[in-house]
Amino acid sequence: MKRLVIFLTAAALAASACSGSDAAPPTTTGTAPPEATTTSVFRTAPQLPLNEGDGTFAVGTLFPLTGEDSALAPALTGSAQLAIDDINEAGGVLGQEVLLFEGDSGDNATDTANQTVDQLITSGSDVIVGAVATDVSQRVIDKIITSNVIQFSPANSWPGFTDYDDNGLYFRTAPSDLLQAGVLADVINRDGRRTVALTYQSTEYGEALADAFTQSFTELGGEVTERLPYPPDTTDFTAIADVILRSGADTAVTIGFDETAALVETLDGLGIGPSTYPVYGVDANTPTIGTLVSDPAVVDGFVGVEPAVGTAFLFDFTQQVDDRAETDGFYVYAPETYDAIIISALATEIAGTDEPSAVAAQINDVTRGGVQCSTFADCLELAISGEDIDYEGLGGPYEFTDAGEPTAASFRVLTYSGAATPDPALDEYVLSR
């Protein structure tokens, strides 16, 4: 088994940033791809080549090798390499070995992602897996799709991507935040809570999630007795906490980011902190809130949900990822990355071409409505025999909508028990579908 990995190095990106169309090609472990043409254009890049397929399926990765999310990169890179290895061991795609181009997305403080996307497109990537951060994807999505290349994120959850004008070329294995709202409502209802005081950032993110939660909880027979929006720069939550105290609601739900720590500390000061009064959060605040409060005891009892796969149950997968990268046991978005590549490869085989728009037309159906299968080799055998397939991935059954996103996903229910991080002994995993 061979894997041709082509690394888009920092030196190549720096050269392309400085020299325009005279950019040096990326460093490779095989035949060098075409010389890259770079651009500073933010939204579209009409001078980049239009991908019409060349018979060889190529995957580019847009992962945070540098920047604030760089801790995620090893597991993402290792899972991508594992997917390519599994595909090539099963015979490749369209009778050819799959190519892997590895690139850095950086973070939103840099223009690294734009430069990397230029390299990935000119190198012949048929699908770009990434980015992780929604704001990074927002910066590059138009450049990718106007070059007739598929973008497939393992992590983006912004609801706005559902109806984005993407020419049918954007997909994600991560669920929309709106699916998370339904899971949170289910958990609160299961816990016997019937009335909720709901606080949320008055941003597009906060309002969309608050509306979705309100609808889901109401459909379950619950009642949102208070809706308490606040500006994202709020630091004083005294007035909001006082309304919650007087509301009579039997629980509070917080939809926000790091500022949630100040809200919870204020609630605790009124005697209605999570240790005595049920308080729930979402993926944007739950995993880190224990490190942001003055004393972890303040968040004892805090409960939240986040999209996550129980990788403790995927020992063989995580072991193979560890063989390819130093993950330190951190596998966030690794199953979703693996699945994005497998789904794309199967869609390419079914399409009979690596021309991205033809591949994209097959992606949704790979995840729904056929004979269930869970490995590339098994699914490929079924597809070759003429069967419609339904890929059941490491991250879940997916069941993509026509918009190219999951209707089924795995979520982790996290609970704090006095420490600065959620108590893993109290973790639950639920499948929403």
Regions found by a protein language model. Give the residues of each.
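Extracytosolic ligand-binding ectodomains
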Residues: 2-7, 19-433
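C-terminal motif of bacterial Sec signal peptides marking the signal peptidase cleavage site
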Residues: 14-17
